[in-house]
Amino acid sequence: MKMVYLGLFLIITSCVISSGNLIYECKWADSIRLKDKNPTHEFCKKKCEEKNTDRITVQHGFHSSDYRCTCQGEKILETPYQSDGVKDCHRI
């Protein structure tokens, strides 16, 4: 009986180890507070691209208030579990 349990344990462990991380493409939005008033859309897009690197695509960067830029786009997220804050995403 112990051999059966050991065999099941090894099979389950190997499946978990081999599954690895899941990869998701997610929509994201962020904002950047600035020192200068009334930034242009071009300035905001540049700031969004500078701030958001590492597997992130900036689709829009625009002036949203007197001292703030809003950034939107997509990012690639690798996670072992779907419950790790994965929202507004689809698996790729």
Swiss-Prot record:
Keyword annotations: Disulfide bond, Ion channel impairing toxin, Potassium channel impairing toxin, Secreted, Signal, Toxin, Voltage-gated potassium channel impairing toxin
PTM annotation, UniProt: Contains 3 disulfide bonds.
TM stretches of this protein: none
Tissue specificity annotation: Expressed by the venom gland.
GO cellular component, one term: extracellular region
Secretion signal span: 1-20
Subcellular location per the Swiss-Prot or TrEMBL entry: Secreted
Entry's Gene Ontology molecular function annotations: potassium channel regulator activity; toxin activity
Family, as annotated: Belongs to the scoloptoxin-15 family.
Role: Inhibits voltage-gated potassium channels (Kv) (IC(50)=about 10 nM), when tested on DRG neurons.
Name of this chain's protein: Kappa-scoloptoxin(15)-Ssd2a
Annotated source species: Scolopendra dehaani
Lineage, opening ranks: Eukaryota, Metazoa, Ecdysozoa, Arthropoda, Myriapoda
